[in-house]
Amino acid sequence: MFDFNGTLPLMMFQFFLLVAVLNAVFFKPLTQAIDERDGFIRTNNTEARERLAKAKSLTEQYEQELAGTRKQSQQVLADAQAEAQKIAQTQITEAQKQVQAEVMKAQAELESQKQSAFSELEKQVDTLSQQILNKLLGSTLA
């Protein structure tokens, strides 16, 4: 079946030479390209994970800052509303005091005019009473 003659070692030599040539020409560059591609993918994957972690960290940080800013703006708004309410209450109180003072002044002026009018009327009543009395007594005396 098999002859073990000089062709067998020659065939083995050709086979090993073919394997060496294929290894040098085809398999090493292919393996090198696959290794480079694998390294590139691993590097990109690692960088992507790092970027994702950094993005998540920044997102959390910005959300915390946003929540803090919202609380701060709500506090500023509440303070402004309280201050506006306080100012409005102060102005209302001051206006009420001014109105009360005006009312008191008007009442005092009316009271003064009333007293003046009563005193004038009393003078006129006295004068008229005197005139009536003079006419009545003067006509009965005459």
Curated annotation (Swiss-Prot):
Quaternary structure per UniProt? F-type ATPases have 2 components, F(1) - the catalytic core - and F(0) - the membrane proton channel. F(1) has five subunits: alpha(3), beta(3), gamma(1), delta(1), epsilon(1). F(0) has four main subunits: a(1), b(1), b'(1) and c(10-14). The alpha and beta chains form an alternating ring which encloses part of the gamma chain. F(1) is attached to F(0) by a central stalk formed by the gamma and epsilon chains, while a peripheral stalk is formed by the delta, b and b' chains.
A Gene Ontology term for the protein's cellular component: proton-transporting ATP synthase complex
List, alphabetically, the Pfam families matched: ATP-synt_B
Keyword Cell inner membrane (UniProt): no
Q: Which PANTHER family match?
A: ATP SYNTHASE SUBUNIT B', CHLOROPLASTIC (PTHR33445:SF2)
- List the keywords (alphabetical): ATP synthesis, CF(0), Hydrogen ion transport, Ion transport, Membrane, Thylakoid, Transmembrane, Transmembrane helix, Transport
Transmembrane portions of the chain: 7-27
Keyword DNA repair belongs to the record: no
- Give the protein's function: F(1)F(0) ATP synthase produces ATP from ADP in the presence of a proton or sodium gradient. F-type ATPases consist of two structural domains, F(1) containing the extramembraneous catalytic core and F(0) containing the membrane proton channel, linked together by a central stalk and a peripheral stalk. During catalysis, ATP synthesis in the catalytic domain of F(1) is coupled via a rotary mechanism of the central stalk subunits to proton translocation. Component of the F(0) channel, it forms part of the peripheral stalk, linking F(1) to F(0). The b'-subunit is a diverged and duplicated form of b found in plants and photosynthetic bacteria.
Stated name of the protein: ATP synthase subunit b'
Q: Which InterPro entries match?
A: ATP_synth_b, ATP_synth_b/b'su_bac/chlpt, ATP_synthase_B_chain
Q: Which family does it belong to?
A: Belongs to the ATPase B chain family.
What subcellular locations does the record give?
Cellular thylakoid membrane
Q: How does it sit in the membrane?
A: Single-pass membrane protein
Please give the organism. Acaryochloris marina (strain MBIC 11017)
Task: Show the GO MF annotations.
Answer: proton-transporting ATP synthase activity, rotational mechanism; proton-transporting ATPase activity, rotational mechanism
